[in-house]
Design a protein with these regions (language model features):
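Interfacial loop-to-helix junctions that mark the boundaries of transmembrane helices
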Residues: 1-6, 30, 49-58, 122-128, ...
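Membrane-water interface at transmembrane helix exits
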Residues: 18, 22, 47-51, 69, ...
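Interfacial loop-to-transmembrane junctions
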Residues: 196-215
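Hydrophobic alpha-helical segments of integral membrane proteins
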Residues: 21, 25, 29-36, 77-92, ...
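Alpha-helical transmembrane segments in multi-pass membrane proteins
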Residues: 6, 10-14, 18, 22, ...
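Long, highly hydrophobic alpha-helical transmembrane signal-anchor segments
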Residues: 27-61
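Glycine/small-residue-rich loop that forms an oxyanion/phosphate-binding "nest" at active or ligand-binding sites
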Residues: 57-98
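Helix-loop-helix junctions within the multi-pass membrane cores of secondary transporters/permeases
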Residues: 95-171
């Protein structure tokens, strides 16, 4: 859990720095930076999506995961949670829910979140999560300057999501082979790609609704 705790702390520190710098950065500059990050997110998504080999498993996982997530309204649930936090922290502004949802997806859905958490739970090595912490802390500064304090609240999402994967890793060790992790990385990277498209304003995909696909690909890998 140490790696995940450090990761959450880095996001909070990055958010604090972003809030301090926010007033001095023109809106057009933060908008340009956000689009730049969006393009980088797209690149990361495309790169990671090439990890998988079982295309059929990915397609079925994405379709079934999207159906399950939509039925459960996961994206809406995240937005409602963001709005609830927004009401509790009125100073966060009307964009708090957007910052919370966007940052949570960026920090949780990526390959490093899954693989790093698994590595932490299976081997006790936190190196990948430490690297992710540095990257997340830097991006939190920029994201906060554009989206506000909601970005900092995503640290809770990271703590819960990555912490759960780390704790469950020991129990799932027999089935989480390198090949299975590669398929999970592939699906997660597809979601990162979709998020990047949202960030540059090309699409409005409800990415959170597809998160179950990351875990559905595990049984599908062995069945197909």
């Amino acid at each position: 859990m140490l790696g995940t705790i450090v990761n959450a702390g880095a996001i909070i520190l990055g958010c604090a720095a972003g809030l301090l710098l926010r007033r001095g950065i023109p809106e057009r500059v933060t908008d340009a930076v956000m689009k730049g990050i969006g393009l980088c997110v797209i690149y990361i998504g495309v790169s990671g999506a090439l990890e998988g080999e079982k295309t059929i498993a990915m397609i079925i996982a994405m379709a079934a995961g999207g159906a399950i997530g939509t039925a459960l309204d996961l994206n809406g649930g995240m937005e409602r949670l963001g709005r609830l936090l927004e009401e509790k922290l009125a100073r966060g502004g009307s964009g708090l829910s957007t910052g919370f949802v966007t940052a949570s997806l960026i920090y949780c859905v990526g390959a490093m979140a899954v693989v790093g958490s698994l590595q932490s739970g299976l081997t006790g090595s936190h190196d990948m999560l430490y690297t992710k912490s540095l990257l997340d802390g830097i991006s939190a500064i920029v994201l906060t300057a554009s989206l506000g304090i909601g970005v900092g609240l995503s640290a809770a999402s990271v703590l819960i999501y990555q912490g759960a994967i780390t704790l469950l890793a020991g129990l799932l060790a027999p089935v989480l082979t390198d090949a299975v992790v590669a398929e999970m990385t592939c699906v997660g990277s597809m979601l990162i790609f979709a998020l990047g498209l949202n960030m540059i304003g090309v699409t409005k995909i409800k990415v959170m609704d597809f998160v179950p696909a990351i875990f559905l690909v595990i049984p599908l890998y062995y069945v197909l």
